[in-house]
Amino acid sequence: MIKIERKETPHTQEAMDDLQEACNTGRSYNTEHVNQALQEVFHGKCYICENKEATSYQIEHLIPHRGDKKLKYDWNNLFWVCAHCNNIKSDKYEPILNCTTEPVEHLIAFRKTGYFGTDEKLEFVPVKDDNVAIRNTILLLNDAYYGTTPQKKMEARIIRRTLRKDLSKFKEYVREYQEAENEEEKEDIAMLLKRELKDSSAFTAFKRWLIWDNEEKYGELEKFIPENQKKKLFDI
């Protein structure tokens, strides 16, 4: 989970028009325009687990609406989520951090320790402050990545496997960058690192924290993180 800017997209106004009409008529908010706009805003990935390879995505209410029309049809309360995380979250974690207004990855550290087997572990740790929203978000992240039922645990293993492969690829780019023999080769790999550290990348929070946790070794690579998300801006 990282901060995602809720930017205007080609379908944003169409989505908001659909939501207004749906609110007036009592119809569903689940329209094609709303789905398209949310997919674009959230870069096609689940806002909770950051997986981009899920087979099913849904519209989720950050604040459960419980029949409240304003919350039900509020564009700013609608988020793009995979079916796995949506089913786990439901209305059980309240409040959680709003990733469109709060710098989640600067409030929570995202770490993967160990390797294959029992030593591998995902950790979500408050960076400085610790409040109810942060604690609830950490509970949600743990349940999303590890599952809460036998079926959800199986789904979570697939997400962790996807995360492992993605991080392994990222680490390989880092190694190639550090071992590059000339500037041309380094520039080519730099383009890959920039792509992997963008908001649109899968599992971005883990990749950024890999750099922040290893400043002596990887400090040079922070220049590839978008300017508005650099560590120094948040004093962590």
Describe every region a protein language model picked out.
Residues 1-45, 67-73, 168-175:
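Short, charged surface segments at domain edges that flank catalytic/cofactor-binding sites
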Residues 85:
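DNA major-groove recognition helix of helix-turn-helix/homeodomain DNA-binding modules
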Residues 31, 75, 203-206:
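Bulky hydrophobic/aromatic packing residues
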Residues 48-80, 89-108:
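Histidine-centered nuclease catalytic patch
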Residues 9, 64, 113:
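Residues that form or immediately flank small-molecule/cofactor binding pockets and catalytic motifs
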Residues 14-17, 89-183:
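Domain-exit/linker segments immediately C-terminal to small folded modules
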Residues 139-236:
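C-terminal, charged low-complexity interaction regions
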